[in-house]
Amino acid sequence: MRIAINGFGRIGRSFFRLAFQAPGLEIVAINDLGELENLAYLLRRDTVYGLYEKPVEVRNNQLVVDSHNIFVYAEKDPAKLPWRDLNIDVVVESSGAFTSYAKAQPHLDAGAKRVVITAPADSQVPHVLPGSNNDKLSRDLSRIT
């Protein structure tokens, strides 16, 4: 599954650390308005989780983690992101800015197949808590929180 992360703050970086090592998941791209060098620094050194065990560097305007190149963008408008060209299956929306059904739509318009909103969202977006209400999950859903 090809994943893009929109918003590389506390939640985006925490998700990255878990997903990067998970079989079947590939972090393809990150979109964040911060400077690339700063994003790399914050991934390397976390005040809660400590030093990241994988090597992290910046090369050719990409984040390189354990020899894996990750595209990095600094785009305010998600509709302008190249999710279609990158064949993104899921965007993890962790910016905190796109917390409604309608606000997540630009990611889908840009070519992502699904959006997972990490913040509380409006009532149109199904709220799923793993281990509690997994029965709400369906392949037909394009957005969940």
Explain the meaning of each model-derived region.
Residues 1-145:
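N-terminal Rossmann-like NAD(P) cofactor-binding subdomain of oxidoreductases
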